[in-house]
From Swiss-Prot:
Family according to the record: Belongs to the class-III pyridoxal-phosphate-dependent aminotransferase family. HemL subfamily.
KW Isomerase (keyword) present: yes
NCBIfam families: hemL, PRK00062.1
InterPro entries associated with the record: 4pyrrol_synth_GluAld_NH2Trfase, Aminotrans_3, Aminotrans_3_PPA_site, PyrdxlP-dep_Trfase, PyrdxlP-dep_Trfase_major, PyrdxlP-dep_Trfase_small
PROSITE patterns membership: AA_TRANSFER_CLASS_3
Keywords from the named record: Cytoplasm, Isomerase, Porphyrin biosynthesis, Pyridoxal phosphate
Source organism (scientific name): Methanosarcina mazei (strain ATCC BAA-159 / DSM 3647 / Goe1 / Go1 / JCM 11833 / OCM 88) (Methanosarcina frisia)
Enzyme class: isomerase
One term under GO cellular component: cytoplasm
Biological process (GO), any one: protoporphyrinogen IX biosynthetic process
Coiled coil: none
Protein name: Glutamate-1-semialdehyde 2,1-aminomutase
Metabolic or biological pathway, per its Swiss-Prot or TrEMBL entry: Porphyrin-containing compound metabolism; protoporphyrin-IX biosynthesis; 5-aminolevulinate from L-glutamyl-tRNA(Glu): step 2/2
Catalytic activity entry: (S)-4-amino-5-oxopentanoate = 5-aminolevulinate
Amino acid sequence: MVSEITLEKSRQMYEKAKTLIPGGVSSPVRAIKPYPFYTASANGSKIRDLDGNEYIDYCLAYGPAILGHNHPVIKEAIRQQLDRGWLYGTPTELEVTLAEKVASYYPSIDMLRFVSTGTEATMSALRLARGFTRRNKFIKIEGGFHGAHDAVLVKAGSGATTLGEPDSLGIPADFTKHTLQAPYNDIETMTSLVEKNRDDLAAVIIEPVLGNIGPVLPLPGYLEELRKLTEENDVLLIFDEVITGFRLAMGGAQEYFGVVPDMTTLGKIVGGGLPIGVFGGKREIMEMIAPSGAVYQAGTFSGSPCSVAAGIAMVDYLNEENIHAKLNSAGDYMRAALSEIVEDEGLDYHVCGIASMFKIFFGDEPHNYQEVLKCDKEGYLAFFHRMLASGVFLPPSQFETNFISAVHSDEDIEKTLEAYSENL
């Protein structure tokens, strides 16, 4: 294992980047303290920085790289599309092909629309839910992340029965007055909130598994009770499966748990690692979108040919190679081995995860956002740097999920477990 690494070239690049890019990064999650490493290349399960250090990667671009980096099947699909052109501004057969494939795996989706990001997908889904129901309010889960648009950037922890306050400057408090919050895994509070607001409540949007603060898993029966509650009160249920879609199973969390929402958002994996987002749902809802209906949505890069071509290759490969059986088995092994390490070390930590997602919480097992916040964030950050020095790249935040790819080898996993054992 690597005991020391040099990041001088990355440090110099960071100093230059700060003069040109706010914070030196294009997304805040990449701003590793005291400075991030800058990637030069990636292949398979490995990622290499400017200084030549190589790491086993469990961040995987925060989820999309389910086949690892630079996969030949995805690369060939992109190369073939590049030869035909990469942006037309017209419909393509590729869109129809991928739409048909996605809909075949997701029982909640009769029709869908392609966008360029997960943020666009959830933003458009909420607009559509409001337009379809002619109602204004929606409920999100405390700690649930649905992208960077104004309506969902609301602080968690302010109480499920109070109106949300913006979590960023630049968002008027009046704008988020229709954004309500409920704790995850708390069906009683959710029931009270739904029943109190149902006359003006368009939807409940939820990550079935909270992937951006964990993963934190649903307690047994929680999703089923939520589905029943929304149906009884004529409120739309939206599953944000940007992380779990094609990750837990071909049909995402709704296949894994057997709970079917009214609408679904997808991203990350479905584009094969290229920019994409999807929102879909029941036909009567989706037909409200322009030009068929009066809910407007548009985008120059929506249905980008290269992204859609990569998505077709990704979906076909995942299905034909039965990838999820291998992935989920590796996830089970990783979590069991980590639990044994934690127990042997006598640590008050908790190993959590599902399918090919895993994490060690530096604290007790959390079931909601407030419990996640009790974890030792500084302790985790120090651990992250020790793992990086040992050649293992994990997400730098206690609140982000680790992912396993189809190309992580047995040797990769054993080296990783050795690093955990040495560095916890």
